Regions:
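Outer-membrane beta-barrel and related beta-rich outer-membrane complex signature
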Residues: 62-69, 154-158
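Short linear capping/connector segments at secondary-structure termini
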Residues: 29-33, 89-92, 159-166
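Conserved, well-structured interaction surfaces
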Residues: 39-40, 44-48, 52-56, 79-152, ...
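Membrane-proximal, proline-rich intrinsically disordered regions
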Residues: 20-67
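Core domains of carbohydrate- and sulfate-ester-processing enzymes
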Residues: 71-77
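Bacterial Sec-dependent N-terminal signal peptides
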Residues: 1-32
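Short clusters of hydrophobic/aromatic residues that line enzyme substrate/ligand-binding pockets
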Residues: 24, 36-37, 69, 84-91, ...
């Protein structure tokens, strides 16, 4: 009897595991879609999201950690990140601190790009408020890029709102990144 149940359980397990052969396709990829930015509330909430992104950078101490690695001001804490005190050069994208800064900056840059790009399409808001929100989004975008270039020099420059995952990137020369940040566009 035990052998029957064991065989039946194994057979059912195999059927359940092999029953789903479709790949999961996430639609939409983010709640920040063009339709979201096209509304007055979405326009303001997009800017709020960009501001909230600064908390994810500074609040987790990732930026602080990256600026003092290799100095005598930073010691291994309870998290056991021994690479910091051993002066190892193991800081690449597989390191959580590095990956988190990179991801957060580009996520927030894309949010700022959405606010900037879809501002002209917003109706029902005074031009003065739209202009102020766009100026704030441009400042935040420039700040996120400034953080990126301080750590990595040449970085990918995204000037438009990305609605789908991007699987390739080209590094933009540092001088061009700075010129873009200083321009009014």
């Amino acid at each position: 009897m035990k052998k029957k149940y064991s065989c039946l359980f194994s057979l059912l397990s195999i059927l359940f595991i092999s029953a789903c052969n479709k790949q999961l396709r996430e639609e939409p990829h983010s709640i920040l879609t063009p339709e979201f930015f096209a509304t007055t509330q979405g326009f303001q909430r997009g800017l709020d999201a960009a501001y909230a992104g600064t908390r994810n950078l500074w609040g987790t101490q990732n930026l602080f950690t990256m600026t003092v690695i290799g100095t005598d001001e930073f010691y291994t804490g309870k998290d056991g990140n021994n690479d910091i005190n051993k002066y190892n050069s193991n800081y690449n994208t597989s390191n959580g601190t590095v990956a988190a800064i990179w991801k957060e900056c580009y996520t927030n840059i894309n949010t700022c790009n959405g606010v900037i790009e879809y501002a002209p399409k917003i109706t029902g808001l005074p031009d003065e408020q739209k202009g102020r929100n766009v100026a704030e989004a441009k400042f935040l975008r420039a700040n996120f890029y400034f953080l990126l270039v301080q750590f990595w020099g040449d970085v990918t420059l995204n000037r438009n709102f990305q609605t789908a995952p991007v699987t390739s990137a080209t590094r933009t020369p540092l001088a061009e990144v700075y010129m873009t940040l200083l321009s009014r566009t």
